[in-house]
Regions:
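An anion/phosphate-binding loop that grips the pyrophosphate of nucleotide cofactors and donors
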Residues: 60, 362, 469
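His/Asp/Glu-enriched, well-ordered alpha-helical/loop segment
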Residues: 303-312, 320-323, 327-343, 348, ...
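Non-cysteine beta-strand/loop elements that form the S-adenosyl-L-methionine
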Residues: 63, 258-274, 364-374
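Flexible loop/turn segments at secondary-structure boundaries
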Residues: 109-111, 140-141, 208-209, 215-222, ...
């Protein structure tokens, strides 16, 4: 049924139009403008009042399978001491029969002891079951003795293996995560995924770009996320990036894009002090972090993927990794020029000046995570302690935008929770004030730019005639608010294809639809 929305309509289009009327019918936008044509006058009308209508939000980088798993499990981010963390583990263990206790969010910065929990402490908290606690940044974990006993011998030979403390970094962490994800049952996985989509919808998301490929047998996680993308009956959109440098896997899945973190991560992260830097860490002159791949390996991958017409995204946190990503994409485009490739560098937390110039010249886009700028699990004081004055160059949003680089907003969930309002707030309140974005620019990170990033802007991302009526109603008008007030925004309704989002899709319904041919993912 046709419906009219009257009030503040923020289009988030290229010209930042704000209109008075929007007419929706059968899931599409028929009209947007300031005068309501006579042909639509008789349709039912919703007067927004102080509320505002915008495009639904998109999250351009999250580890959806991991987010779904930990979203339904043990979250230790609220612990303020190690005894409290142990109590949380014990409580969860009493209430759940899981053979492996999986948790997320350990941080040295939020507990009084200012260190990670140890293997011995995990042993005392949970002596009878294996425990696997992922660090807040998603790049390390702590395990107990029972978990160590379960791991295959090949994991114990990898870089980052520390049996004495139970902390696993670099390749040892990735291999441990691969091993554990194989233990999660398929029905539980599907239930967790459906619940996670419902939780994202509550925050106003109607699209996500998920990076997949974390060690499930036969890449089952990728297959399941593809089924999810096709099987959701609400109209929620999912675009899958397969984290692999093995393009045979991409061909078999017939995906138009490749990359993410894990196998396509070029370095580590600041929290583990293994993000690859051009100059040593301020607190350790012997440490410049780690590049996981040689230049030759990355160039071979990007050239091959670019020749096949794939969209490429790679994780790079430090400036050395950022430069490696730029160099490899430039080499690929010199080898096989493409006008509208939309290759991207995920995070780009500490970009170099020359690398940004290349991004602007080559059309390299950056899916970044504004919430990192106000992350209590990785506070600014810590970043200054390891980077010195370089901390002031993290995520220079204003500079990148003024250079013409397309930025989009994501969460890197489960590292931060999917929350577009928090991301918009952070982008407008950078701790270096001159690097903040305007409110319209910040809104676009999670709307138009999010859709553009995966070639979806012709159908989604802005409220324009002919596009899908994927929309959110906010309680207030962000354009009349001050940047420091933006956390007062609340999502009241998510509308996909013009209809209110409905929670609780069943497993059988998802599989029945998701296994059919067709559908865009």
């Amino acid at each position: 049924m046709m419906k009219i929305y009257e009030g503040t309509i923020i289009s988030c289009d290229r010209e930042n139009h704000v209109n008075r009327y929007l007419v929706e019918d059968k899931g599409r936008i028929l009209y947007v403008g300031d005068e309501l044509p006579a042909a639509y006058q008789g349709a039912p009308r919703e007067v927004l009042g102080e509320r505002t209508l915008l495009p639904c939000f998109g999250d351009t980088h999250l580890h959806f399978m991991s987010y779904a798993l930990f979203n339904a499990g043990l979250d230790v981010r609220s612990a303020r001491s190690l005894p409290e963390l142990c109590e949380q583990i014990q409580k969860f263990t009493r209430e759940n029969n899981d053979k492996i206790i999986m948790g997320f969010g350990a941080s040295t910065h939020c507990v009084a002891e200012k260190r990670l929990i140890s293997k011995d402490e995990l042993d005392r908290a949970c002596p009878d079951r294996a425990v696997f606690i992922v660090k807040y940044d998603g790049h390390a974990c702590i395990v107990n003795s029972r978990m160590i006993a379960m791991l295959p011998d090949k994991v114990k030979t990898l870089r980052g293996w520390h049996a004495d403390t139970g902390e696993m970094n670099q390749e040892a962490f990735f291999a441990t995560a691969d091993f554990i994800t194989k233990k999660v049952s398929l029905p539980r996985t599907i239930r967790n995924m459906l619940r996670a989509v419902d939780d994202m919808a509550e925050k106003g998301f109607g699209m996500m770009h998920t990076v997949s490929g974390v060690g499930f047998p036969l890449d089952l996680d990728v297959a399941m996320e593809m089924i999810l993308g096709k099987g959701l009956d609400s109209g929620f959109q999912s675009r899958v990036f397969f984290q692999t440098m093995n393009l045979d896997k991409i061909r078999k899945k017939k995906l138009p894009r490749v990359g993410g973190c894990f196998a396509t991560a070029l370095d580590g992260c600041f929290g583990s002090e293994d993000a690859a830097l051009r100059q040593p860490y301020a607190n350790n002159p012997q440490n410049r972090g780690i590049l996981f791949h040689s230049n030759e390996e990355v160039i071979h991958f990007t050239k091959q993927a670019n020749r096949e017409g794939l969209q490429i995204e790679m994780h790079a946190i430090g400036d050395a990794a950022f430069n490696q990503a730029v160099m490899a994409i430039e080499a690929a485009l010199e080898d096989c020029p493409r006008e509208d490739h939309r290759h991207g560098i995920i995070h780009a937390c500490l970009p170099s000046e020359e690398g940004l110039q290349k991004c602007a010249e080559l059309g390299i886009q950056i899916p970044l995570q504004p919430a990192f700028l106000m992350w209590n699990l990785e506070p600014l004081e810590f970043l200054y302690s390891i980077l010195g004055d370089r901390a002031e160059r993290i995520s220079p949003l204003r500079k990148m935008t003024d250079m013409g680089i397309v930025l989009s907003g994501g969460s890197d969930a489960p590292c931060t929770l999917p929350d577009p309002i928090a991301g918009i707030y952070a982008a407008c309140n950078h701790y270096i004030p001159e690097q903040s974005l305007t409110i319209p620019e910040a809104l676009k990170l999670f709307t138009f730019n999010a859709a553009w990033t995966t070639f979806d802007e012709k159908e989604r991302g802005s409220l324009e005639t002919g596009k899908m009526a994927d929309m959110v109603i906010l309680n207030r008008n962000p354009l009349t608010m001050k940047p420091n007030e933006l956390l007062g925004l609340k999502v009241e309704h998510l509308l996909l294809k013009g209809e209110p989002y409905k929670k609780g899709q069943g497993m059988l319904s998802l599989l029945a639809k998701g296994l059919l041919p067709g559908g865009r993912i």
